[in-house]
Each structure stands twice: as structure tokens, then as C-alpha cells.
Amino acid sequence: MRFSVLLTGLAAAGSIATAERTCGAVPPRAYEKEFTEALNSLSPEAASADLTAGITIDTYLHVLTSGQTGNIPDSQLQAQINAMNQHYSQAGVQFRLVKATRTDNANWASGRDEAGMKKALHMGTYSSLNIYFIPNLSSGLLGICYFPRANPSQTTIIMDGCMVRSGTVPGGETTNYNQGKTATHEVGHFLGLYHVFSENGSCVDADMVADTPAQSKKTSGCPSSQDSCPGGGVDSIHNYMDYSYDVCMNQFTPGQANRIAQSWRAFRAGH
């Protein structure tokens, strides 16, 4: 899933003065069918696996730089892990930082040669999370991540994970998006979550989660309230899977937590 920013003025490299998130990709074709089939194919033992102790995900952070552009100190990398652990505590998920790497490569730091970069840097298994922090993602993107797939090939495993704009880490220079919540949003896709809003402007159950009301449009900024589909509850403007400013995001729902657990069992546990 892709986040992008629409610039409204000139900004220094790696920083954004004013921006709005937009999306440049959609989930895989017929993904909900794949999701359901993967769940139904689980053994009784796997389907009923006890996750009351939560899910702990081995996490690898990769910092891509072009000279000094894009460098992130260890303190901010740890702050990003801490932020994700705080955000996902509502969903029973925690992230264990296994290793952080730094690579000076101007091509990769500009978001080019994704396959070559991941072939060189990817670590762990399909149950591991790799996040690549890139200062200049193409087209002003804030982040890109991939949904989990059934029976992943070796190529799918290597291409898995998230690419996130470097300036969105806690204390980064991307105005309105520098509390680490871009990574939190992107990892939601890694765990099988959709956006809470409809991609085509309709008032349908776009995210397959019962306790997020129908929402026909993304949220911009941080409004006091928004109700794009009257009658079913106000929009989920504070949800991590909307497009609000970081300061506005503070919620995963129990339904989303349940979908994360289902997704983990179906696609990533044991891989």
C-alpha cells in the first residue's frame, strides 16, 4: 500500500512544509477471497492457536542514505520501535528490534531498484518485518507496504515489508507526519488491514471490519469530526488506518485486532 504527499510549496530535501496523504496502490486482486481461503485451510490446531499472550514480531530496520541525507540516529530508530509498540499494544502486537543496518547508496535512497535493494538487505523470514527508511521515495510517497500472501514464493518473501520515508520517524522533519505513525499505518497492511475508508467513494464495508463505520472518503488533516456515511456512526478519523495527521491518530479497534490475529495465523505464523 502506498502513501504519497502532495506538496503545496517548496521544501528542503527530505522535509515537507505542507502535505496531504494520498494512496497510489490497492490490495491484490481478489484479496479477500485469498484471505478467507487461507483461513479456512488452517489446521484445527493452527486456527485455534492461543494468541492471548500477543504476537511478537522480529523486526529489522534498514536506513538508506545518500551521503548524510536520510541518516537516522539509533535514538530515533528506537523511538520508532517504541511508538509502534505503544500503538499496537491495543491490538496485542509488539515489535522486537533484532538489527538495524545503514547503507549509503544514492540509487536506493531515491527509491529506485527496490528489488535489488531488498535482495541485498532483506533479513529474517516471512514472519519477520523489514522496514526500509528511504529519504526520497518516488512521487513524494510517505510509505509503501505489501499485504501478506498465501504460499509466498522466495521472491515474494524478499519483496515483503515496508518502505517508509525517513522524515516520518518520531522527531523527523516531515511536518504533520513525524510521530512515527506512517510506519504504524504501513505495518497495518503487512498485518492484513485495509484502509478504513472506501477506495471508490461508496458507503460499503470497505475494510471488512464490523466495528469501523462505513466511510466514503479519506480524512485530511485533523478535523473535530467527520461523517461521510450518515446513519452508521461517524468516520474513524482517529484510526491508524485512515489518512489523518499523525497527531490525530490514536486507535485500532477490537475488530481490527481480531483481523490482525486471523491474518497472522493464516499467512505469517510459522513461516
Curated annotation (Swiss-Prot):
Query: What domain of life does the UniProt record list for this protein's source?
Result: Eukaryota
Query: One GO molecular function term?
Result: metal ion binding
Which residues, if any, are the signal sequence? Answer: 1-19
Question: Do you know which PROSITE patterns this protein is assigned to?
Answer: ZINC_PROTEASE (PS00142)
Q: What are the positions of the active site?
A: 186
Keywords of the record, alphabetical order, are:
Disulfide bond, Glycoprotein, Hydrolase, Metal-binding, Metalloprotease, Protease, Secreted, Signal, Virulence, Zinc
Location(s) in or outside the cell:
Secreted
Its chief place of residence is secreted
Provide a GO CC annotation, any one: extracellular region
EC number(s) from the headed UniProt entry: 3.4.24.-
SS bonds (residue pairs)? 222-248
One family from Pfam that matches here is Peptidase_M43
Q: Could you tell me the Gene Ontology terms of the biological process aspect for this record? A: proteolysis
Task: Report the glycosylation sites.
Answer: 136, 200
Detail which positions bind Zn(2+): 185, 189
**The keyword Coiled coil belongs to this UniProt entry's keyword annotation:** no
> Any idea what job this protein has?
Secreted metalloproteinase that allows assimilation of proteinaceous substrates. Plays a pivotal role as a pathogenicity determinant during infections and contributes to the ability of the pathogen to persist within the mammalian host.
Q: Which family does it belong to?
A: Belongs to the peptidase M43B family.
Protein name in UniProt: Extracellular metalloprotease TRV_06892
Q: Which organism is it from?
A: Trichophyton verrucosum (strain HKI 0517)
Species lineage: Eukaryota, Fungi, Dikarya, Ascomycota, Pezizomycotina
